[in-house]
A protein has these predicted regions:
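Active-site HxH/HxHxD metal-binding segment of metal-dependent hydrolases
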Residues: 31-32, 40-114
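Conserved beta-strand hairpin/beta-sheet module of binuclear metal-dependent hydrolase folds
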Residues: 1-42, 141-155
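Internal catalytic-core helix/loop-beta-alpha segment
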Residues: 102-135
């Protein structure tokens, strides 16, 4: 079951499996109280969240990671993301209101390879896999569910592809995603795009 959570400028998603769940992305740092209100409104409690996973480590997608992990949420990181875990540290340190927030807790990360993601998700009762889609940033990943729902973070929308003819990395990412025959594309900031009706 997928629940879209909107409490700022970034679409975040709660994906519940039969044996666990994933919170995909957060909003910017400093939005914790709005996050609490949004999950309560949707009948979700903090203890319902097994793992947090960011589609990438730009500040508007991982701002609450440190706080949520310190409160007991497990921290899932893909191996392709490790070099970029602290990308936003300097950005947050320049903001007086945010500089005291906990940094990304790299020592608590459970790092897995994309090739092992299907088995990892299956253990949570979630059917799907996680693939590297590095055209937006080197650490960007996409979560593709077997139900046809696909979560691409800040990947440039496919409808703009004609304007990016020379961007081979973007074309490669979309070819990879489309090989799964997705039904719905969930973006980090834009409305979802329905490709196939059931």
């Amino acid at each position: 079951m997928v629940t879209k959570l909107k409490y700022g400028n970034t679409n975040t998603y709660f994906i519940r499996g039969a044996k666990g769940s994933i919170l995909l992305d957060t909003d910017y740092a400093g939005t914790l109280q709005m996050f609490y209100k949004e999950i309560k409104k949707n009948g979700i409690s903090l203890k319902d969240i097994t793992y947090i996973l960011a589609t990438h480590y730009h500040p508007d997608h991982m701002g609450l990671v440190g706080e949520l992990v310190n409160m007991g949420v497990k921290f899932l990181v893909m191996d392709t993301q490790v070099p970029n875990l602290h990308f936003s540290d300097e950005i947050f340190s320049r903001d007086k209101a945010l500089r005291f927030l906990p940094p990304v807790p790299e020592d608590k990360a459970e790092v897995i390879a994309c090739k092992d993601s299907r088995a990892f998700l299956a253990a949570l009762g979630i059917d799907g896999e996680i693939v590297s889609t590095p055209s937006h940033s080197e650490d960007s990943i996409t979560l593709v569910l077997d139900s046809g729902e696909c979560f691409v973070g800040d990947l440039e929308p496919m409808e703009y592809m004609d304007g990016y003819e020379e961007n081979k990395a973007l074309q490669s990412d979309w070819e990879k995603i489309m090989s799964f025959s997705p039904r719905v594309i969930h973006y980090g900031h834009a409305p979802e795009r329905i490709l196939l009706q059931l």
